[in-house]
Amino acid sequence: MASQGTKRSYEQMETDGERQNATEIRASVGKMIDGIGRFYIQMCTELKLSDYEGRLIQNSLTIERMVLSAFDERRNRYLEEHPSAGKDPKKTGGPIYKRVDGRWMRELVLYDKEEIRRIWRQANNGDDATRGLTHMMIWHSNLNDTTYQRTRALVRTGMDPRMCSLMQGSTLPRRSGAAGAAVKGIGTMVMELIRMIKRGINDRNFWRGENGRKTRSAYERMCNILKGKFQTAAQRAMMDQVRESRNPGNAEIEDLIFSARSALILRGSVAHKSCLPACVYGPAVSSGYDFEKEGYSLVGIDPFKLLQNSQVYSLIRPNENPAHKSQLVWMACHSAAFEDLRLLSFIRGTKVSPRGKLSTRGVQIASNENMDNMESSTLELRSRYWAIRTRSGGNTNQQRASAGQISVQPTFSVQRNLPFEKSTVMAAFTGNTEGRTSDMRAEIIRMMEGAKPEEVSFRGRGVFELSDEKATNPIVPSFDMSNEGSYFFGDNAEEYDN
C-alpha cells in the first residue's frame, strides 16, 4: 500500500504510538494481556467463582462489560446528569452464573464502579490501561460481527444488506481510539459518516457554533480514516471530495454509498486482530505464564497457541449444538466473520458452516431466559494450522458468491482467490455518473470491470503448522471452488439490537 510508511502498525496503536522495535512491541502487547489476566483473576476471587465458573465465557463477558462500563466516562457523566428510576449511576453489574447442586443458577451482582476501577488499575500497575479496555471492546465487537447480521442498520442508512462484509466493527463504541478505527470496515465508516450527514440535514445547528467546529473536525477525521483504508487513487480522491464539502448533504451520501459498494470489489485495508475473552488470559496468567516477558502478538501465532492450551466453557440452551457454538466463538476469537469459509475450514481443520446453518443463538443469555435446563459444554477453540492476520484487502477477483453476502473481507494472509458476485455488484452501478465526482466514478467502475476471476490474492502466502512458530514453511491450501464461501449466505442470523 502506497502510504504504508506514514501509518503506525496496530501494535503501535495499541502501545503509545512511539516507534518501537518488534521485541518492544511484543513486550508491550504482552503487558496489556497480563493486566487483563490479573484483573480477571482478582474479579473471580471477589465473586468467589470456582475454576470452572471462572472459565465460563458468559461470566467472562459480564466481567468485561462491568469494567468497560466503569470506565465509560461520557456515559457515566450522562447517567449522573439524567438519573433514571432504579438505576444507580455509580454501580455496575450483570449476571454471574454459578453451579449450585448440580444445576446452573443466575445471580445478579452489583459493584461500585469506583471499586472496579480500583481493581483494574491495581492489576495494571496503577495505570488506566486504556489499551486493555480497547482490546476487550474489540473482542466484543468481533463476537457481535460473528453473531449478528446488521441488515436493519444497513437498510436504515440506505445501504444494501448484501454489503455486510464491509461492516466489521460496526458495534464498536466511539471511544475505541486508533486501535478501534484500524479494525473498522469500509461500511462501518461509511455508516458513521452517513448518520452524521443526516443529522446535519435535519438539524441546522449541527455544523454551527463552537460545537459545530468540533463536529466538523470529527467529520473530517472520519473521512481521513476512511480514505486511508482505500487502496486506489480514485476512491481516495472521492473521499477528499466528501471531506472538503462545504455543507455535506445528499450528494455526499450518494458518493459514500458508491464508494462502499465499490469496496466489495476494490477492497479496503481493514486490520484484523485475535482478541480473546478475559477468561483465556486469566488462567494463563495464574498458571505462571508471563506475557510481558515472553512477548505476545495479536496478529501472529500467539493467540492460536494460547487457544490450543485453554479450556473455555459455555452455557448451552436446550436446542443448541455445542459444536456450532464453538464455531461461532472460534470465528470471533480470530476476527474472521467476513473471511472465506473454505479457508476457515482449512485452518480450523473442521468444516466451518454459514451462519444460517448453525443451531446456536448468541453467546450471551438474556435475563428472562429460563435457567432450568441450561447445560454447559467445552468450547472447541483449537485449530489445525495458524496463519498471519492481514490488514490489507488483498487484490481482487471474482467467483460465484451468495445471495446474502456478496464479497469477503480477508482476515488471513493466505493465497486464494477472493469470491464476489461481480454481476450483482456491477448491477448497482447503473445510472448516476454526472456531477463533480463523475470522473472518479468512471475510473472506479473501469477498475471494477477489469477485476479478473483468475487473479490470486496474497500470492505465495500460506498457512503454517502449529509447530512452525517462525513461519518458515508456508502451506498453500487448495480449495474446492464449488463450495460456498460466504458466512452470511442468504441468511437468517438474528439482528444486533443494542
From Swiss-Prot:
Task: Provide the function of this protein.
Answer: Encapsidates the negative strand viral RNA, protecting it from nucleases. The encapsidated genomic RNA is termed the ribonucleoprotein (RNP) and serves as template for transcription and replication. The RNP needs to be localized in the host nucleus to start an infectious cycle, but is too large to diffuse through the nuclear pore complex. NP comprises at least 2 nuclear localization signals that are responsible for the active RNP import into the nucleus through cellular importin alpha/beta pathway.
Q: Which GO biological-process labels does this protein carry?
A: symbiont entry into host cell; viral penetration into host nucleus
Molecular function terms from GO: RNA binding; structural molecule activity
Question: This protein is called what?
Answer: Nucleoprotein
Annotated Gene Ontology cellular components are: helical viral capsid; host cell; host cell nucleus; ribonucleoprotein complex; viral nucleocapsid
Give compartment(s).
Virion; Host nucleus
- Position of sequence motif Unconventional nuclear localization signal: 1-18
Ranges for the region named Disordered are 1-21
Q: Any idea which UniProt keywords this protein has?
A: Capsid protein, Helical capsid protein, Host nucleus, Host-virus interaction, Ribonucleoprotein, RNA-binding, Viral nucleoprotein, Viral penetration into host nucleus, Virion, Virus entry into host cell
- Compositional bias annotation for Basic and acidic residues: 8-21
The family assignment reads: Belongs to the influenza viruses nucleoprotein family.
Answer yes or no on keyword Ribonucleoprotein: yes
Give the species this sequence originates from. Answer: Influenza A virus (strain A/Memphis/6/1986 H3N2)
